[in-house]
Amino acid sequence: MASEVRGLRKTKIGVVVSSKMDKTVVVRVERIYSHPQYAKVVRDSRKFYAHDGLGVSEGDKVKIQETRPLSKLKRWRVVERVS
């Protein structure tokens, strides 16, 4: 029991839409999928609050990773900038 293996944490890639808070950014992650019944390509987006330790700015494309709850809304952290 001393050496338990933890599962891989989820990662997502998105664009920073707001960096006005101190050490927190809002990242919009887009998802494109085909509707199962109508076969139309649908574009959907979600916003995630993430801890910013790198000092990213609005418009940057970043990779975020799941983490422990850091505040009421923050459950993700910025891992790296993606070019």
From Swiss-Prot:
GO BP: translation
CDD domains associated with the record: Ribosomal_uS17
Alphabetical keyword list: Ribonucleoprotein, Ribosomal protein, RNA-binding, rRNA-binding
GO cellular component labels: cytosolic small ribosomal subunit
Pfam family, one: Ribosomal_S17
Protein's job: One of the primary rRNA binding proteins, it binds specifically to the 5'-end of 16S ribosomal RNA.
UniProt superkingdom: Bacteria
Protein's UniProt name: Small ribosomal subunit protein uS17
Xref: InterPro entries: NA-bd_OB-fold, Ribosomal_uS17, Ribosomal_uS17_bact/chlr, Ribosomal_uS17_CS
Molecular-function GO terms, alphabetical: rRNA binding; structural constituent of ribosome
NCBIfam families reported in the protein's UniProt record: PRK05610.1 (NF004123), uS17_bact (TIGR03635)
Gene assigned in the entry: rpsQ
